[in-house]
């Protein structure tokens, strides 16, 4: 069995153009590739935010949205969310429900303090969990906390440097803020 994880590369028109090994793709010259971001809420309406593991290649130890990931070859963004989010936050797949795409055309490019680039076509999703007892994957998540969405939005606006650049940019979109603050 081949355990090499691939990411799907994109051309300048946003179409798949090949694959690259995930562990090798994030450099100072990262090619455009497909990913997703997801914001997860519990039954109280609180939002899960996670602190990226210190071992992450990009933005280690930074607070960010609930989960992010890359599409595998042949996979839709929705399928990637259903596969990857439960793995990262530590729940069974059947406990992740109500997956909805809020920002289908979101993309961004950001450079971290070491010059490593993230450049992604990254649809943004919301989802809910039916059980908020989580066991996060240590290679992905250092810690996590449930917060009121309005408090998170205020914190990101007040101190954007404390959060991932993609989350800061995503929360500038009214459609996402509305989806996170309404039931």
From Swiss-Prot:
Binding, Mn(2+): 26, 33, 70, 118, 120
Keyword Isomerase included in the entry's annotation: yes
Catalytic activity: isopentenyl diphosphate = dimethylallyl diphosphate
Pathway in which this enzyme or protein is active: Isoprenoid biosynthesis; dimethylallyl diphosphate biosynthesis; dimethylallyl diphosphate from isopentenyl diphosphate: step 1/1
Keywords recorded for this protein, A-Z: Cytoplasm, Isomerase, Isoprene biosynthesis, Magnesium, Manganese, Metal-binding
UniProt EC number: 5.3.3.2
Catalytic-site annotation from UniProt: 68, 120
Domain Nudix hydrolase: 31-169
Known function: Catalyzes the 1,3-allylic rearrangement of the homoallylic substrate isopentenyl (IPP) to its highly electrophilic allylic isomer, dimethylallyl diphosphate (DMAPP).
Similarity comment text for this entry: Belongs to the IPP isomerase type 1 family.
Entries under NCBIfam families matching the protein: IPP_isom_1, PRK03759.1
Protein's recorded name: Isopentenyl-diphosphate Delta-isomerase
Recorded name of the encoding gene: idi
């Amino acid at each position: 069995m081949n355990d090499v994880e691939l990411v799907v590369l994109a051309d300048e028109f946003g179409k798949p153009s090949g694959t690259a090994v995930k562990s090798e793709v994030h450099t100072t010259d990262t090619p455009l590739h497909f990913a997703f971001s997801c914001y997860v809420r519990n039954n109280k309406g609180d939002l899960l935010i996670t602190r990226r593991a210190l071992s992450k290649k990009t933005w280690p130890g930074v607070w960010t949205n609930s989960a992010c990931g890359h599409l595998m070859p042949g996979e839709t963004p929705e399928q990637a969310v259903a596969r990857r989010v439960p793995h990262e936050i530590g729940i069974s797949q059947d406990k992740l429900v109500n997956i909805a795409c809020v920002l289908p055309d979101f993309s961004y490019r950001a450079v971290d303090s070491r010059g490593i680039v993230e450049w992604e076509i990254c649809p943004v999703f919301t989802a809910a969990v039916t059980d908020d007892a989580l066991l996060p994957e240590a290679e992905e998540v250092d810690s996590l906390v449930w917060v009121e969405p309005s408090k998170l939005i205020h914190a990101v606006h007040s101190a954007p440097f404390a959060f991932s650049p993609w989350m800061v940019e995503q929360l500038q979109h009214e459609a996402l803020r509305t989806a996170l603050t309404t039931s």
